């Protein structure tokens, strides 16, 4: 599973959801990663994953919340076979 993140500036990046990001998500959300995305998917969870991916990649981001979300134009969950440029 990967995230395609499009920032408000137009910058697009693609991020792998690594085991450490899954673990951080489960601590944050208090629910299992795969269950959250198969049965109870919320966009706020996707935005949190985008925040964590950017943060883990060394990008300086605001504290998670509305200020961070305002820096996003679009976030998509993409599979391994999906074309990230579509």
Regions found by a protein language model. Name each.
Residues 1-14, 19-86:
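Charged interaction scaffolds used for protein-protein
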């Amino acid at each position: 599973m990967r995230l395609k993140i499009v920032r408000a500036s137009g910058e697009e990046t693609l991020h792998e959801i690594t085991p450490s990001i899954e673990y951080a998500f489960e601590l944050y959300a208090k629910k299992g990663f795969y269950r959250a995305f198969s049965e109870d998917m919320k966009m706020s969870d996707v935005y949190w994953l985008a925040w964590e991916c950017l943060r883990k990649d060394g990008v300086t981001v605001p504290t998670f919340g509305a200020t961070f979300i305002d820096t996003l134009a679009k976030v998509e969950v993409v599979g391994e076979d999906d074309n990230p440029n579509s």
